[in-house]
Amino acid sequence: MCGIVGYIGQSDAFPVLIEGLKRLEYRGYDSAGVALIGNQDNLNVYKTKGKVSNLEAMAADKDCSGHIGIAHTRWATHGEPSAANAHPHVSMSGELALVHNGIIENYQVLKEQLADKGYTFKSSTDTEVLVQLIDHYYQQNGKDLVSAVCQALNDAIGAYAITVMEKKDPGHIVAARQSSPLVVGVGKDNKDFYIASDATPIVEHTNKVVYLEDGEIADIRVGEELNIINLEHASCSYTIKTVDLDISKLSKGGFDHYMLKEIYDQPNCLKDCMSGRLIVDQEHPENNHIVRSALRDYRDRLVNAKHIIIVACGTSWHAGLIGKQLIEKMCRKRVEVAYASEFRYVDPVIEPEDVVIAISQSGETADTLAAIKLAKEKGALIFGIVNAVGSSIARETDTGVYIHVGPEIGVASTKAFTGQVTVLTLLALALGHEQGTLDDADYHEMIEELSEIPQKMEKVLEQAPMIKSLALMFTYAHNFLYLGRGMNFPVALEGALKLKEISYIHAEGYPAAEMKHGPIALVDQDMPIVFIATHHQLYEKIISNMQEVKSRNGRILAIVTEGDELVKNIADNEIEIPKTQNALIPLLSVVPLQLLAYYVAVDKGLDVDMPRNLAKSVTVE
């Protein structure tokens, strides 16, 4: 991992590749590199540890000519972050260059076999093994690159997205994928082709793309139609799709960081998410309804399902925990929330009548994709909740809903979380009303309340200056505890995750009642305790939990419902959110926690958008 860019065509390749890498910086990385076949048919490779800007500076006085090239941002999986381990990797013959996302699981065996044939290695990566393996077959079969790629990939076990080029033919480039995303952009009259891990580096050049499927190889030649085959050389049909992606949404829009922009984007993002789905009639609330297009084709299976399994990772898993409570309350169905990374390895009980909901911002999360493939094999209906249109998970599911919050660039997810929770709320409302477990009055009232969330979220954002001041009091801390109950317990988990992701402060989220079963031993005046203490059915109980902390000299920051005087008498500091229905509280209570994490990290002088060791899209298991 993490980001691939390739170009072949009539333009100078280097600017296209560098700008493409910059578009992919949000995915997270620790090194970067580029390879070009120059105007004199020389293969030039430049690699460096650190930022794309470092690579750009390094290449400033180098030969960057040529109309074909490949580039990569690497997030270390095999081998430490270094220039030697950075991609592209070049074959020992010097004739091939390759970039790769994924993990070749049997690389050690392949490496030993190649070493016996005289191959030597300059890095400790699985990627270099792959390019040497391709080169081995390339030298054997008369330097037919496509055949060599097919033979090598038949030997390789694991996940990959690769792009490879050959020095002898600067009009030819080959790309392939297996369990790792890869997109090919098609220029006018096939005069230019663009390759990338996702569409963001491509859309400023062309909106015509082909999403490669598992086991497919793209054989690309300038001026010719795109040719896609499988590993047995059989031709594969494909569809050129039109991508609708607003490039302006990829900018910071005047904010210091993408993360802050995306926090402030949330009111408008939720309006977009609900647009055309949530119909509100102010004069006649009895006409309020949800457009149920996602339920239409699979209505009976969704209504009749007795067991729903939600699979997700990270922030999406926290959204799934909220979805569980929403669906169980409104639809009276049994819901299980599983870590996608663990799901396949516990021999899960999945019946053909079950529904599996997969949640992923990128739509490319490897563990989630593998989980739904298993569930599909067992006959379950797969329902996707993703942000990235055309992504692997979106294509693998039977039905689903896009959250439509626009590209999320900051590694720490914000607007995708609230978008996912909004879609889960829409799903629970629609399904509950469809099957009669949610009565008309509650259904219509909830729709009206949900439509008001963006406006209420704006009121929360107005408190950002105060939250910024509060954050200054907490940068000293080495540990945080986040506590909530009911719908606010997943919010506590999400708040803790945001803080640890970008500020590198250890933080844990717990159900508030579990505090007395261990975490209370940590409470002292140096450990901030964040309570999400809004009005809900467990309000009195969380007040009791706060008193327990207060009696042990704990420092309390509370998220409270506006007008709450009781909590103010206990907490050291508080942040108010507007009143709303219990089921919708997470959409508001999470926003102050996002801002708190952001301002703590900024005060510590950290790179908020690209925190260390993290990748935006985790495309390896």
Question: What are the residue ranges of the model-derived segments?
Answer:
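Glycine-rich oxoanion-binding loops at beta->alpha junctions
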Residues: 50, 67, 71-84, 281-300, ...
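Active-site phosphate/pyrophosphate-binding segments
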Residues: 154, 266-270, 274-309, 399-528, ...
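Glycine-rich phosphate-binding loops that contact phosphosugars or nucleotide phosphates
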Residues: 303-445, 449-452, 534-573, 596
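Glycine-rich, anion-gripping cofactor-binding loops and their flanking helix/strand elements
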Residues: 182-188, 192-209, 315, 341-375, ...
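Conserved short alpha-helical segments that host acidic/polar catalytic motifs at enzyme active sites
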Residues: 1-252, 256, 261, 268-307, ...
